[in-house]
């Protein structure tokens, strides 16, 4: 049907007869000569229909409109010197069409312009409703192709250079505790019983290690029924990897090699030979988050020990209750940040409130080195405390010190949000810089206040450090997350591979022996048959594709995404189903019917 893709043609093809297929991207009539930009998935080529040179094709060219589907037969010609277009790979040539076939027309008004030349902003709801048109647009087309090349580069590296095996794991499995809610699938063959769609292939990839497949990977589809944000989808894709007989440092080294391969292949970027590492405790202390953006220098300073005896009760009271007082020092903050922004109703107050803070205290360092603040703080800081505070924070004349006081998690969350907001506002972040950082030594568990129990910070199959096994409740996990400019792109750990230790971890999170056996008996039993030491990692393909494409939402790198309400605007899923189907499954809905 065609001899070439549109974007393949160059000067070397001049004089050749070619057949092309694609969509009319744009039509222009210049003094009776019709110019068509025809588009396929590789790009654009200019088609010329001249009534004097090729009169047999002119009527068809004259009838064409944007997004008509066509087949073009003609001869490749060099463009006149004054018509060269250096912005196009095909900008030195054009096709004189002597035959044009209309394969399909557009029978409705386009909801928005698709043309590569059109840069109008289109509402996302409209784009998602007509996603097949949106995907024709150059930006979206490039995003999907970047995603394809990302997965292609991963496969080639893991299989050709690292001897990994691609193995599929079940999509219909059983529901297990921990983590987000499962998507459940009723079993018609087994009434009253349910499958769950996998949140990850975690257990199956560990079983593959027990099975002797020492280097496994999969581009896996995963499902989580959770509240959505800009970077979350109910169904998502991850690169899933698991390796036997490798230490944590060996796994980290292999993954650094993988990232270097991906970035060099796709962006021609040379990443460093090794990526820096930072413990979870250090990241939380310095940046208030376990995924710090280290492209700029604003750091939090813990002054709890200095202010625990302060007469200012907001500070001393927070510390006595087991909380912290931290400072975010802002160079030149006096000139750039007004009190209005810090007080209730101000944007910085609102940013801190989003992290849970009830207010913001501040100190300004005046040009003469004296401090300016509210009386309650100034009156309750001794000269020695003030001097020590300025020294610890590195404050100089012109500095603004923003304080967070309260429960540690709230102080960290609120000040880390302020740090990012001010870093962006003050243009401290180089948008072209890439910082990759490993966060290590996570706590094994965190306290769930609602359920009044410990829960695994990552998942309950993560191995503790051997020296911490005696007291699991305070143990560090042999876990590692890879952070890209403040976004987590991958996370993994060494795994438990001994049944007794796995039972102890289940017990620590409140799973009884009976529950553990019911939910995970098959895994515990497998560990009794010679399970090797193993570990792994998983990367979010959607997020990686987003970052490599320079987008701000993963929805722009997924062909058919859901909205933040977990709906597909194209197919109108989810939808009600026929009562006959529910009857076969022995299910009855208690929800009110929708109009």
Swiss-Prot record:
Reactions performed catalytically: tRNA(Asx) + L-aspartate + ATP = L-aspartyl-tRNA(Asx) + AMP + diphosphate
Keyword line: Aminoacyl-tRNA synthetase, ATP-binding, Cytoplasm, Ligase, Nucleotide-binding, Protein biosynthesis
Record flagged with keyword Protein biosynthesis: yes
Renumbered residue ranges of the record's region Aspartate: 202-205
UniProt EC number: 6.1.1.23
Residue positions binding L-aspartate: 178, 224, 458, 495
GO molecular function: aspartate-tRNA ligase activity; aspartate-tRNA(Asn) ligase activity; ATP binding; nucleic acid binding
Superkingdom of source: Bacteria
GO biological-process terms attached to the record: aspartyl-tRNA aminoacylation
One Pfam entry name: tRNA_anti-codon
A single GO cellular-component term on record: cytoplasm
Binding site for ATP: 224-226, 233, 488, 540-543
Subcellular location: Cytoplasm
Site (Important for tRNA non-discrimination): 30
InterPro entries: Aa-tRNA-synt_II, aa-tRNA-synth_II, aa-tRNA-synth_II/BPL/LPL, Asp-tRNA-ligase_1, Asp-tRNA-ligase_1_N, Asp/Asn-tRNA-synth_IIb, AspRS_core, GAD-like_sf
Similarity remark: Belongs to the class-II aminoacyl-tRNA synthetase family. Type 1 subfamily.
Assembly notes: Homodimer.
Role summary: Aspartyl-tRNA synthetase with relaxed tRNA specificity since it is able to aspartylate not only its cognate tRNA(Asp) but also tRNA(Asn). Reaction proceeds in two steps: L-aspartate is first activated by ATP to form Asp-AMP and then transferred to the acceptor end of tRNA(Asp/Asn).
PANTHER family: ASPARTATE--TRNA LIGASE, MITOCHONDRIAL (PTHR22594:SF5), ASPARTYL/LYSYL-TRNA SYNTHETASE (PTHR22594)
Protein name as catalogued: Aspartate--tRNA(Asp/Asn) ligase
Lineage per the UniProt record: Bacteria, Bacillati, Cyanobacteriota, Cyanophyceae, Acaryochloridales
């Amino acid at each position: 049907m065609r001899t070439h893709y549109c974007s393949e043609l160059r000067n070397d093809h001049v004089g050749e007869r070619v057949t092309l297929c694609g969509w009319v991207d744009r039509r222009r009539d210049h003094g009776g000569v019709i110019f068509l930009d025809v588009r396929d998935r590789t790009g654009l080529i200019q088609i010329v229909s001249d009534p004097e040179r090729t009169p047999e094709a002119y009527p068809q060219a004259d009838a064409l409109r944007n997004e008509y589907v066509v087949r073009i037969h003609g001869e490749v010609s060099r463009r006149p010197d004054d018509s060269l277009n250096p912005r196009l790979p095909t900008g030195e040539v054009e096709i004189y069409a002597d035959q044009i076939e209309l394969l399909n027309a557009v029978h409705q008004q386009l909801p928005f312009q698709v043309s590569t030349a059109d840069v109008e902003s289109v509402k996302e709801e409209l784009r998602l409703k007509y996603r097949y048109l949106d995907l024709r647009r150059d930006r979206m087309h490039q995003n999907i192709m970047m995603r394809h090349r990302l997965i292609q580069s991963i496969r080639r590296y893991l299989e050709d250079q690292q001897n990994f095996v691609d193995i599929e794991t079940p999509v219909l499995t059983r529901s297990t505790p921990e983590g987000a809610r499962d998507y459940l699938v009723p079993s018609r063959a087994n009434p009253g019983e349910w499958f769950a769609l996998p949140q990850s292939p975690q257990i199956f990839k560990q079983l593959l290690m027990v099975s002797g497949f020492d280097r496994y990977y999969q581009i896996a589809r995963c499902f989580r029924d959770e509240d959505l944000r800009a970077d979350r989808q109910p169904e998502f894709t991850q690169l899933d990897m698991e390796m036997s007989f490798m230490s944590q440092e060996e796994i980290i080294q292999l993954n650094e090699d993988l990232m270097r391969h991906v970035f060099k292949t796709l962006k021609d970027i040379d990443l460093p030979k090794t990526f820096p590492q930072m413990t979870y405790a250090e990241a939380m202390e310095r940046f208030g988050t376990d995924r710090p953006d280290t492209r700029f220098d604003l750091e939090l300073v813990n002054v709890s020990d200095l202010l625990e005896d302060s007469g200012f009760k907001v500070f001393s009271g927070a510390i006595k209750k087991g909380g912290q007082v931290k400072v975010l020092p802002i160079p030149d903050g006096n000139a750039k940040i007004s009190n209005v922004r810090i007080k209730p109703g101000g944007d910085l107050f609102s940013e801190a409130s989003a992290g849970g803070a009830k207010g913001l205290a501040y100190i300004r360092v005046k040009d003469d080195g004296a401090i300016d603040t509210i009386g309650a703080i100034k009156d309750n800081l001794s000269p020695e405390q003030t001097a020590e505070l300025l020294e610890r924070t590195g404050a100089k004349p012109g500095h603004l010190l923003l304080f967070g006081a309260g429960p540690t998690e709230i102080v960290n969350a609120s000040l880390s949000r302020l740090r990012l907001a001010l870093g962006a506002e003050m243009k401290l972040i180089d948008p072209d810089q890439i910082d990759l950082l490993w966060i290590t030594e996570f706590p094994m568990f965190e306290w769930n206040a609602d359920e009044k129990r410990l829960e695994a910070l990552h998942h309950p199959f993560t191995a503790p450090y051997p020296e911490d096994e005696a007291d699991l409740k305070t143990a560090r996990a042999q876990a590692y997350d890879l952070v890209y400019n403040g976004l987590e792109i991958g996370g993994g750990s060494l795994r438990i591979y001994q049944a007794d230790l796995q039972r102890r971890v289940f017990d620590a999170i409140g799973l009884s022996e009976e529950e553990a056996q019911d939910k995970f008996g098959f895994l515990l039993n497998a560990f009794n048959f010679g399970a090797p030491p193993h570990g792994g990692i998983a990367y979010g393909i959607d997020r990686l594709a987003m970052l490599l494409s320079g987008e701000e939402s993963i929805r722009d790198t997924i062909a058919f995404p859901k909205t933040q309400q977990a709906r597909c605007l194209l197919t109108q899923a989810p939808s009600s189903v026929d009562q006959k189907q529910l009857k076969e499954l022995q299910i009855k809905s208690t929800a009110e019917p929708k109009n």
